[in-house]
Design a protein with these regions (language model features):
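M16 family metallopeptidases and their MPP-like homologs
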Residues: 1-25, 44-52, 123-125, 130-163, ...
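Proteolytic maturation boundary segments
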Residues: 5-149, 295-297
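A generic local secondary-structure boundary/capping motif
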Residues: 36, 284-286
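Polar/charged alpha-helical tracts
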Residues: 68-72, 232, 278, 282
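A small/polar active-site loop signature that marks catalytic segments
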Residues: 270-284
Length: 298
């Protein structure tokens, strides 16, 4: 686009310098005044439209119903949002410190191998590929393959449900707030043959990243509100999923290639009724019960 339109392609440093110059010229009262022009109190510049699926039996919104919904929202008295952030550490009670029980240098590939007192294996390798970034991965053999086909729905939802859950004493929303200003993330996932933890951070936020990893092993917090929100998103997506020849063919090919393994059947809306949050959390505990099974690379 920049090449075709003959526009300059700014570097991150140049963009930062320009923003430093422009931001002081935009005080909050100027922004508020601009918003008043965009959102007129007289509603003179408002366009309301609705998109939905066209199918038999669908009840469609009318002009009157859309206008009423808008007017009702306008009439609501909304209290100012109060952002309550928990003022407590990510880990409430610090665990007993472990130890490095052995170290080995691998000169051929340029990494150091550590064995920790909990049995975990750690591979450390410093590179100059991307300054200021620390990449973290941990893996253990197992994964979905250890579970029966009757667990299919919970296994299919596992990754998303865990990412929507909280950690420690923090719900999913509270966790996002307490991590504001920090550049650290960790995820727990369950593919077919392994369980993985992965993350990244800046050097100054390494402790936060390791704390999050510790909590994924010891204290994933159940967040019913976030879980219900996720299930509703799945319902909407699966309900409106277009039945196409391509998707049917792909499902059949996948099912055949995996020897008719029931765990490979695509999710349907009715399957969501069998989703069990407690069981998903139990599976997470089972797969992270023994850190000695894991090899971590940093």
């Amino acid at each position: 686009s920049n090449y075709l339109e003959k526009e300059p392609l700014l570097s991150i440093e140049q963009t930062y310098q320009i923003m430093q110059q422009l931001t002081p010229m935009l005080p909050v009262d100027v922004v508020n005044e601009a918003m008043k022009q965009l959102i007129s109190l007289s509603d003179s510049n408002v366009v309301i439209y609705n998109t939905t699926t066209e199918k038999e039996g669908m009840v469609y919104s009318t002009e009157a119903s859309l206008k009423k919904a808008y007017d009702d929202a306008r009439a609501e008295k909304i209290e100012a949002y109060v952002d309550n952030v928990k003022q407590e550490p990510l880990i409430a009670e610090q665990p007993k410190a472990g130890k490095i029980v052995s170290e080995k240098e691998n000169a051929k590939f340029g990494y150091k191998e550590l064995t920790l007192s909990n049995g975990a294996r750690v591979l450390l390798k410093k590179t100059n590929l991307k300054e200021g970034e620390v990449l973290f991965n941990g893996s253990s053999k197992g994964g979905k393959s250890l579970y029966d086909a009757k667990e299919r729905v919970n296994l299919d939802l596992f990754n998303d449900v865990i990412s929507y859950s909280g950690l420690g004493n923090f719900s999913s929303t509270e966790l996002q707030k307490v991590l504001a200003g920090k550049n650290a993330n960790v995820n727990l996932s369950l593919p077919n043959l392994h369980e993985y933890v992965s993350g990244s951070c800046t050097p100054k936020d390494m402790e936060t990243m390791f704390q999050m990893n510790y909590l994924y092993f010891t204290n994933i917090k159940k967040d019913e509100q976030a879980f219900n929100s996720l299930i509703n998103q799945y319902r909407a997506a699966l309900k409106n999923k277009s039945p196409s020849a391509e998707s049917a063919l792909q499902d059949s090919v996948t099912y055949t290639l995996h020897a008719h393994d029931a765990r490979q059947i695509s999710l349907e809306e009715k399957d969501l009724d069998n989703a069990n949050y407690d069981r998903i959390l139990q599976i997470a505990k089972e797969r992270t019960a023994n850190a000695a099974d894991f090899t971590f690379t940093i």
